[in-house]
Amino acid sequence: MTNSTTFQAEKINQHIVKWLLDYATNAKVKGFVVGISGGIDSALTSTLCAQTGLPTLCVEMPIHQAESHVNRANEHIDQLKKRFPNVFNERADLTPIFETFKNQVPSSENEAVLNLSLANTRARLRMTTLYYFAGI
């Protein structure tokens, strides 16, 4: 018995890139802003955006980031910039902002609740930073 479903990576890739181009056109935006963490999700997303040919800004935003993640993020950005002339990058170290925020709000004795709240805070700081770069 043969499997009639085959994975066609190039066809899927082209479909996603076309969808991104259509989305950008309909939204009347000139390009993409992608946060780069050093993980597979941001690497894939930024590569697909770069393949559109539209300006793609890769933003690294460490907050107490492991050096290995920072290195992976920088290596990915460097490789993208070599492959695609439409890729640019910025770095915004959010660690001082995060620490200032933590010092201005009450803590919690429940460590699990505190850790979740701080994880959400890191995500929102990064989101706000990406909105900033998209707006300028």
Where do the model's predicted regions map?
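ATP-dependent adenylation/nucleotidyltransferase module used to activate substrates
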Residues: 2-136
